[in-house]
């Protein structure tokens, strides 16, 4: 009976260690995936600037150097427009 109790305790400890290791591996995998840029964002970015119709907050973020509030414009429009 004592041997069975020890065997069950060892099995429980091994299963809990395995569960902890799997959880750590899953978190590491999620962190790796969350650091990657989505394909759409990779496609819109060229050399550090945002291409046409990409999200922006200031002119210098756009390749055209023209941010219209939230999106990059294809080209800067003349001020008299």
UniProtKB/Swiss-Prot annotation:
Coiled coil: none annotated. Inhibits voltage-gated ion channels. Belongs to the conotoxin O2 superfamily. Keywords: Disulfide bond, Ion channel impairing toxin, Knottin, Secreted, Signal, Toxin. This is Conotoxin Vc6.7. Residues 20-44 form a propeptide. The keyword Signal applies. It is found in: Secreted.
């Amino acid at each position: 009976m004592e041997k069975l109790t020890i065997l069950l305790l060892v099995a429980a400890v091994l299963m809990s260690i395995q569960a902890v290791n799997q959880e750590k591996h899953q978190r590491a995998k999620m962190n790796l995936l969350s650091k990657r840029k989505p394909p759409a964002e990779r496609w819109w970015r060229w050399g550090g600037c945002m291409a046409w119709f990409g999200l922006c907050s200031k002119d210098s973020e756009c390749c055209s150097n023209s941010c219209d509030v939230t999106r990059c414009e294809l080209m800067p429009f003349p001020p008299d427009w």
